[in-house]
From Swiss-Prot:
Matching CDD domains: DPCK (cd02022)
Presence of the UniProt keyword Lipoprotein in the record: no
Recorded catalytic activity of this chain's protein: 3'-dephospho-CoA + ATP = ADP + CoA + H(+)
The name this protein goes by in its record: Dephospho-CoA kinase
All copies of domain DPCK, residue ranges: 29-231
Highest taxon listed in the record's lineage: Bacteria
One record GO biological process: coenzyme A biosynthetic process
Family: Belongs to the CoaE family.
Length: 231
């Protein structure tokens, strides 16, 4: 088992061990993931504030289907012009209602979006790895588990919260029904599947003001592993 639970001191693997820095050369590549509304964006922001280079796959997935892109043209070809709003931009709500209810539709969308996002992410990753000094590159990937990418990273960090709290957050954030929130959760990998690939588990059920303590602890261990690897 490869796990460090930062939230409650349960540790089965020490983050500061040198074998966490598989990439060597002064770079640690972190795969950050978790279910919908599990706090990934908050954790990603906090890691960025501590010096990590953040590659936000959600943002990239929006960029590659912006107005005028080939990605948007492919989406319209696959799903029709009803997924556009009046100004020609993507109607994410309309598209979401299609793909969350239909596995085959979701796979068609992923086949369009994922290669474009991967190309963009690779460019950012290469630029970060070419920089001088010690670098932590965080790939914030909502579908890391679903796409089987855990082994690509030196550290896999999972944001974890009870599913009932996920539902509450989704309903509050998006104004959808509980049924819709549950459908979105069930469309992703399960909580157990996320935890199974985790090297580090961040407990995001804690009050927001308590979360930086967890981030500081894992950041110091990853940074310590980097320094150890450089000696």
């Amino acid at each position: 088992m490869r796990r460090t639970v930062i939230g409650d001191e349960t540790t089965a693997r020490d983050v500061a061990r040198a074998d966490w820095v598989a990439g060597a050369g002064g770079v640690v590549r972190v795969g950050l993931t978790g279910g919908i509304a599990s706090g990934k964006s908050t954790v990603s922001q906090m890691l960025g504030e501590r010096g990590a280079v953040i590659i936000d796959y959600d943002r990239l997935s929006r960029d590659v289907v912006a107005v005028g892109t080939q990605g948007l043209a492919q989406v319209v070809e696959a799903f029709g012009r009803e997924v556009l709003v009046a100004d020609g931009s993507l109607n994410r709500s309309a598209l979401g209602s299609i793909v969350f209810a239909d596995l085959q539709a979701r796979r068609r969308l992923e086949a369009i979006i994922h290669p474009l996002v991967e190309e963009a992410a690779h460019r950012v990753d290469e630029e970060a790895r070419a920089a001088d000094g010690l670098v932590v590159v965080v790939h914030d990937i909502p579908l890391l588990v679903e796409t089987g990418r855990a082994d690509e990273f030196d550290v896999v960090m999972v944001t974890d919260v009870d599913p009932a709290e996920q539902v509450r957050r989704v309903v509050e954030r998006d104004g959808c029904s509980q049924a819709d929130a549950w459908a979105r959760i069930h469309a992703q990998a399960s909580r157990e599947e996320h935890l199974a690939v985790a090297d580090v588990i961040i407990d995001t059920s804690v009050p927001l003001e308590d979360l930086p303590e967890q981030i500081d602890r894992v950041w110091s261990r990853i940074a310590g592993a980097l320094r150890f690897d450089r000696r």
